[in-house]
């Protein structure tokens, strides 16, 4: 599982380049969430070619775009399956069971939630 906080086009470009250097043409089960106030289009344009499937998950930050709205954006950039999940836990489980390498990206809030989950601390609500 790869965790990367790419939340803007510059970081997404570096992520995509590094993914290709490390994994070649391998596709990712992409666990994704992004803040509504970020350049989501710019990020999606760069990371969409990495996706074998998308797993859109909610996040504790109120700034995160809802999974339904995110699905509409992702489908404009990608023709692979886009699956919306009710929880981070179900999204991670589905991604792990996909047969693809798992890539979690799009938001530092998302990475914080994932790291808290892995540490057994759960997810903490944030006002940001």
Regions found by a protein language model. Name each.
Residues 1, 44-101:
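C-terminal helical cap/extension that packs against the catalytic core
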Residues 60-63, 124-128:
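Short, flexible loop segments at boundaries between secondary-structure elements
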Residues 110-112:
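Short, active-site-adjacent cap segments at secondary-structure transitions
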